[in-house]
Curated annotation (Swiss-Prot):
Family, as annotated: Belongs to the small GTPase superfamily. Ras family.
Domain of life: Eukaryota
GO terms under cellular component: plasma membrane
A matching Pfam family: Ras
Claim: Transmembrane helix is one of the keywords in the record: no
SUPFAM superfamilies according to UniProt: P-loop containing nucleoside triphosphate hydrolases
Binding site for GTP: 30-37, 77-81, 137-140
InterPro entries: P-loop_NTPase (IPR027417), Ras-related_GTPase (IPR051065), Small_GTP-bd (IPR005225), Small_GTPase (IPR001806)
Coiled-coil residue windows: none
Transmembrane residue ranges: none
CDD domains, alphabetized: RERG_RasL11_like
Protein name: Ras-like protein family member 12
Gene: RASL12
Length: 255
């Protein structure tokens, strides 16, 4: 005897997007002397430091508002002595990476390539992916430039990440923009990782012994955009934004 049921009701299952992350972990990577700590402290305090301990690695937090959304930004200022050798401590922690080189130091640019390869290999297949920003620092040293802007843009294009050039000792808003853009990229990746699932079946009579299984249909979301060369422009209006709440730990001399 086969059991028969009447008309099945249409079923729609939709994935509901999660709330935007209220906390974003950003890891700063790069060769020693590239300006990682200077960029971190500039973002946190709006000041440029002239001295710091290159062997100090620590994590700092700042309450920010990005696109009218509050977010707690945690920044890990790393102090790798030999490049990307022991990255376990930050790879699993990070939501985003900012990889820094100095435009007046070609070897720091080559170290960046190693970091990009390490992060790219780790992030492959992760959902959501951890976005990466390639950052050329010390544009105030233009006359000593060893890495052209075209070289930086080409490397970013190769790894599909954003690319900027700034100076930690000059404009604060340009540095702030980099960190806020990292937050935006994390939010975008979170949205991309949500794949809506739609199931719809409408049969007048379905037999348990012969009814085919329901098949889930997935709609693929667009792939992330490739590298973009961004020119950061300051705005006096932006300077009226609320100053971030800062948690700054030991190891820095602020001037």
């Amino acid at each position: 005897m086969s059991l028969m049921f009447g008309k099945a009701r249409t079923c729609n299952i939709v994935t509901v997007p999660e709330h935007e992350p209220s906390e974003v972990n950003i890891v700063i990577l790069g060769a020693m002397g590239s300006g990682k700590s200077a960029l971190t402290v500039k973002f946190l305090t709006k000041r440029f430091i002239s001295e710091y301990d290159p062997n100090l690695e620590d994590t700092y937090s700042s309450e920010e508002v990005v696109d009218q959304q509050p977010v707690l930004v945690k920044v890990m200022d790393t102090a790798d002595q030999e490049g990307p050798v022991n990255g376990e401590r930050y790879l699993g922690w990070a939501n985003a990476f900012i990889i820094v080189y100095s435009i007046d130091n070609r070897s720091s640019f080559e170290v960046c390539q190693q970091y990009l390869e390490t992060v790219s290999l780790y992030s492959k297949g992760l959902q959501p992916e951890a976005p990466v920003i390639l950052l050329g620092n010390k544009v105030d040293m233009e006359r000593y430039r060893q890495v052209s802007k075209a070289d930086g843009a080409a490397l970013a294009l190769r790894f599909g990440c954003l690319f900027f050039e700034v100076s930690a000792c000059l404009d604060f808003l340009s540095v702030q923009h980099i960190f806020h853009e990292a937050v935006r990229e994390v939010r975008r990746e979170t949205e991309r990782s949500i794949r809506p699932l739609f199931i719809s079946e409408d049969k007048s009579a379905i037999s348990l012994s012969s009814a085919p299984p329901l098949t889930a249909c997935y709609k693929e979301l667009p792939t992330p955009a490739t590298a973009k060369l961004v020119t950061v422009k300051s705005s006096r209006a932006q300077s009226k934004r609320r100053a971030p709440t800062l948690t700054l730990l030991k190891g820095f001399k602020i001037f």
